[in-house]
Amino acid sequence: MSKKTVFTELSKEILENLLKNLNEEQAILIKFGATWCGPCQKIKSVCEQNFSTFSDNLICVDLDVDDNFEIYGHYKVKKQINGIPKLMVYYGKNSHEKWFLPDDSVSGSDHNEINNFFNRIRKHIK
């Protein structure tokens, strides 16, 4: 199996465009973290392992908040992120009138919660 492409840059405009063009079998997963963040480093391998188990129907975006401060700031203003790490997913089968409201999300570094989050995604994405 080839290595899954994980994107490391995203803007609000690109996200809005992606959300408009997702088909019912697709989803976008966004992970916010930072190299200096201990909890982010704690879940890094768990996230990478889970990313690799999905088909290309799941678009994975792993954002360092220092390199993607603009979109991180947009989420902070909308009170969708109050700290990192934060993972959120948007399913193509759902309408996304408000780009900043994900269909599901998880915060923190608890491995069980992170794995449960990925298991919920598996119910929607093959």
For every predicted segment, state its role.
Residues 1-27, 111-126:
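N-terminal leader/targeting and pre-domain segments
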Residues 7-12, 32, 43-51, 55-72:
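Thiol-based oxidoreductase modules, predominantly thioredoxin-like and allied folds used
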Residues 16-52:
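Local sequence-structure signature of Cys/Sec-based thiol-disulfide redox active-site neighborhoods
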Residues 28-31, 59-62, 86-90:
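Beta-strand cores of modular interaction/reader domains in eukaryotic scaffold and signaling proteins
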Residues 33, 63-66, 90-92, 109:
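Structured beta-strand/turn binding interfaces of compact recognition modules in eukaryotic regulators
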Residues 38-39, 68-71, 96-97, 113-115:
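Eukaryotic short linear interaction motifs
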Residues 70-83:
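Mid-chain, well-packed structural core segment of small domains
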